[in-house]
């Protein structure tokens, strides 16, 4: 092997270093002349080799554009196999940016800008720190990592768009389970016997239909709660990704409660016959629909991003939602 400061020679292959990244070239001999043919980023070549060795793709060498450009697809072929190879090349190139500094900044971005939970953020960091797999966590993580890098001008928007087009999040199997009123009542009683604080969380979940993370957030500053005419609402205005709650509607006035999501998880672990708190949300949506609350209003109350209503008109639904919520509040009085 011969080398200089930025060039390493291994037989007929050259490895060049550029800005901390490595690129592979192959020496080719033609009419007595030696030419260097660009093969691709080292990470692409290694990952493609491993994929081919495992039988994931065929045996055609990966082709890519010269350094400074995003990986090309001239040697990728067509059809499903070509699409898979392009994805491998794109993901391999993206992984080169998973440096310690970028990973730390990405974690801060997930927690502070995207509002993602600590556990989920750590799962995403774990996903981009390992070779890409076709799992929902990895798919979401790589897409978010591409968005993050583009937002910091570390990669071009065009490259981020290629990642978003190539890496799709596979749909999860639909969970159609909706608990019965009897199951809800039983869980509330179990929660009350377990802890008054845990019971309070479950009660607000039943009244509001919002997520556990949102309930815990409003209980940090309960003094912002507004009550009147048998209905209370909390101006939360918390959005992240596809989730966004403007107001938390409920009946029981809020109070400061020292409880964490781990306490809820512990309760659910200890009481296998209790309904998980996430299903309270589904029960609320189902009951509101039974009470003829419009679907758009249910979405607004439960903090789903609008699909049937334009975003600019979404926040104006507050007055309508407040009146419609009274139907559910009346029903709750008998529970």
Curated annotation (Swiss-Prot):
Similarity field: Belongs to the 'phage' integrase family.
Keyword list, A-Z: DNA integration, DNA recombination, DNA-binding, Hydrolase, Transferase, Viral genome integration, Virus entry into host cell
Active site: residue positions: 211, 281, 314 (o-(3'-phospho-dna)-tyrosine intermediate)
EC number: 2.7.7.-, 3.1.-.-
Keyword Transferase: yes
Gene3D superfamilies per record: Intergrase catalytic core (1.10.443.10)
GO biological process: DNA integration; DNA recombination; establishment of integrated proviral latency; symbiont entry into host cell; viral genome integration into host DNA
Protein name: Integrase
The keyword Heme is annotated on this UniProt entry: no
GO molecular function, one term: hydrolase activity
Functional summary from the UniProt entry: This protein may encode a site-specific integrase, which is necessary for integration of the phage by site-specific recombination into a tRNA gene of the host chromosome. Essential for virus infection.
Domain Tyr recombinase: 174-329
SUPFAM superfamilies: DNA breaking-rejoining enzymes (SSF56349)
Region named Disordered: 62-82
Sequence ranges assigned to domain Core-binding (CB) in this UniProt record: 97-189
